[in-house]
């Protein structure tokens, strides 16, 4: 069984003390407050996702995180403890590969959001650069986000959790999940023995390999963090031309086939 890594909340309360009914980094520890200035929290239609700030006006996340009434929070660490750098934005524009519905578990699960207003760089807000080279199998990768720390029940932290996993050969994921095509524009990452993984509610967040932003959390096994069931991540490097084209104003830019 597979799980797209975003789950519904039963009720959205005030952000300062909300407890979200979604899942997050399994097997991780609290992120250092200074290591994720690019990490954003996305709320929409009673759901939660992550995302990555790539410049002062643009956020990259997963296409399946699209919804109405979207709110994007930047500069956040603790949900309960406000800080002077926290900012709220809403989308001005959203861009997809072909359409908002034309994605699969292995292709085009990517969304580029233009914020309604730019954000200023601060101690807790700063963009993450797009990758300068393709990812390498065997790389150590960092995942991060807010949500449950248990694969079987909702146990939600107030602060984002971080964990290190490995970039695996795509064939490992093909062996784990029936129906994956021979080639795709996704990355396979996890720990073969299990215990560490992204999970529901992490969707759209970053996969950072050897210091470079290489992937977007997309989907994986259910329950999360099981042996020989890694996660699937949209390959950012494969979509660079599309991302750069959209940001430059070419709204006709197309994703790779």
UniProtKB/Swiss-Prot annotation:
EC number: 3.4.21.-
Subcellular location: Secreted
Temperature optimum or stability note: Heat-stable to about 95 degrees Celsius.
Domain Peptidase S1: 25-248
Proregion span(s): 19-24
Signal recorded as keyword: yes
CC annotations in GO: extracellular region; secretory granule
Family annotation (SMART domains): Tryp_SPc (SM00020)
Catalytic center residues: 64, 109, 203
One Gene Ontology biological process: regulation of blood pressure
Pfam families in UniProt: Trypsin
Disulfide bridge positions per record: 31-162, 49-65, 97-255, 141-209, 173-188, 199-224
Glycosylation sites: 102
KW Hydrolase (keyword) present: yes
Gene Ontology molecular function: any one: serine-type endopeptidase activity
Keywords: Disulfide bond, Fibrinogenolytic toxin, Glycoprotein, Hemostasis impairing toxin, Hydrolase, Hypotensive agent, Protease, Secreted, Serine protease, Signal, Toxin, Zymogen
Signal peptide: 1-18
Tissue specificity statement from the Swiss-Prot or TrEMBL entry: Expressed by the venom gland.
The protein's assembly and partners: Monomer.
Function in brief: Snake venom serine protease with strong beta-fibrinogenolytic activities, angiotensin I (AGT)-degrading activities and strong kallikrein-like activities in vitro, releasing bradykinin from kininogen (KNG1). Intravenous injection mildly lowers blood pressure in experimental rats, which may be explained by the action on angiotensin I and kininogen. Exhibits amidase activity against N-benzoyl-Pro-Phe-Arg-p-nitroanilide in vitro.
Note: Negative results: does not have activity on gamma-chains of fibrinogen (FGG), and does not coagulate human plasma. Does not induce or inhibit platelet aggregation.
Similarity remark: Belongs to the peptidase S1 family. Snake venom subfamily.
Protein name: Beta-fibrinogenase mucrofibrase-5
């Amino acid at each position: 069984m597979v799980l797209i890594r975003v789950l519904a909340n039963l009720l959205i309360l005030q952000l300062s003390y909300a407890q979200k009914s979604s899942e997050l980094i399994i097997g991780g520890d609290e992120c250092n407050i200074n290591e994720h200035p690019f990490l954003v929290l996305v709320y929409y239609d009673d759901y939660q996702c992550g995302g990555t700030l790539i410049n002062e006006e643009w956020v990259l996340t997963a296409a399946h995180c699209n919804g109405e009434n979207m709110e994007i929070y930047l500069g956040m660490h603790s949900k309960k403890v406000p800080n002077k750098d926290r900012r709220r934005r809403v989308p001005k524009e959203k861009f997809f590969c072909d359409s908002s519905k034309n994605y699969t578990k292995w292709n085009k699960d990517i969304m580029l959001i233009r914020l309604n207003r730019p954000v200023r760089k601060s101690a807790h807000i700063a963009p993450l650069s797009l990758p300068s080279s393709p990812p390498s199998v065997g790389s150590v990768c960092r995942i991060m986000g807010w949500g449950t720390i248990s694969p079987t029940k909702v146990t939600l932290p107030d602060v984002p959790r971080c964990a290190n996993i490995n970039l695996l050969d795509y064939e490992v994921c093909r062996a784990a999940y029936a129906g994956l095509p021979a080639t795709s524009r996704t990355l396979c990452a996890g720990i073969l023995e299990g215990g560490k993984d992204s999970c529901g509610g992490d969707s759209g967040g970053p996969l950072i390999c050897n210091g470079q932003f290489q992937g977007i959390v997309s989907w994986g096994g259910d329950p999360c963090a099981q042996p020989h069931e890694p996660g699937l991540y949209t390959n950012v490097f494969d979509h660079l031309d599309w991302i750069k084209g959209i940001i430059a104003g070419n709204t006709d830019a197309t994703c790779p086939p």
